[in-house]
Amino acid sequence: MSILGTVIVGIVILLGVIGAVVQVWPSAPLVGGAILVWAWMTGTTSAWIIFAVAALVLILGTVLKYVIPARGMNKAGIPQSTLVWGAAGGVVGWFIGLPLGLVLGMVAAIFIVEYLRSRDTATAWASTLQALKAFGWTIAIELIAALTSATAWGIGV
């Protein structure tokens, strides 16, 4: 692969890693797709092995980013719909106030949904904090998977 091609792949991987943090665009498809293009264009056995490792890490990360937070929320008695409403509030907040709006919209939506469910401010706030922890786990798991895959690619380059 040419130097320009490698740089473009690296930029797409970087965008994927950033996507793991900002949660606005999908991280795993960007990182995995970029490494797939690199492996295809490079064509070596080691490139395909690196792609396979990266793909497995990204698939595992995608599964775990749903399973681990869901278990924590289930243990706390918070329905999955709360996280869905939080994500919707985050999207609305993003369009109102960009990154800060994303966080504020998510927190507000989770609190409102949980308050309407429990009719208790303390319970709603505790549920909001638990949902935020779950969201944090989602980001951390996706970021670890993206960085691990990016590192595997970096070793291969």
Label each PLM-derived region with a short phrase.
Residues L30-S46, G89-W94, A108-R117:
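Interfacial segments of multi-pass membrane proteins
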Residues M1-G5, A39-F51, I155-V157:
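Helix-coil boundary and interhelical linker segments in multi-pass alpha-helical membrane proteins
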Residues V21-V31, K75-V84:
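Short, non-helical or kinked segments that cap or interrupt transmembrane helices
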Residues V12, G16, W38, V57-Y66, ...:
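Alpha-helical transmembrane segments of multi-pass membrane proteins
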Residues I13-L30, G90-P99:
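Transmembrane alpha-helix interface/packing and boundary motifs in multi-pass membrane proteins
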Residues F95, M106, L116-V157:
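C-terminal binding/interaction regions
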Residues I49, V53-G93:
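Helix-adjacent hinge/juxtasegments
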Residues V24, A28-L30, A54, L98-V113:
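Selective recognition of hydrophobic, aromatic-rich stretches within alpha-helical transmembrane segments
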